[in-house]
Amino acid sequence: RSSAASDVYKRQCLWKVIGNPVMMAALQIPPISPEIADFIAAKTGAPAHGIMFNSDQWDGYQWDRYRLTSMIAKNNIKNVVAVTGDIHMSFANDIYEKFDGNMKGRRVAVEFVGPSVTAANVDDILADKVGLKLPENDPLFDTVDKALQTTNQHIRWCQCSKHGYVVVEMNRKFAQADWFFVNNKSNSRSGQHWGNSWATNEGTSALYPVKKPLKF
């Protein structure tokens, strides 16, 4: 993870892309007692608004993450984009220099996280571990998505139950990610549909929603 800092610093291209194995943005689980949250934050440096979802992500390597984000901020490096997999879910994230929960700090990068085509995510985990089998479009998953975004305000959009892939395209003006979801993960001929799109303009390090994909 620490090598990402030197790689970004040395690149002279317009877009500095980090091929990222695990989610960079903080992912906290809501909710816990404010007193407990403050205690954890004081002892560990973790964001004070939740408990980390997975310590194998960059949340478990917070000093390395801050080393990267502070280097980007200090050197005023523009157009850093992390393209991430592993978590099997879809996220569009603003990356801040510090993930302290108030979202008043400096944005230094963006992150596009792609889902899995067939590997387990939230709906499969509920079915396998709890025995609760729900369709991917069940309202429960919308509630989960909204709760994660409320707790993690740097997460501009997330989709935790649908399967598919993300296409990222970059040009001189912007970088855009288009998420597509398969209609039926058990049927390779079921087709696909567009899910959502987010983009960042050159020089801004901030995401905004897009009404349609670049290509389908």
Region spans (language model):
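Long, structured stretches of catalytic cores involved in phosphate-ester chemistry, encompassing
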Residues: S3-F216
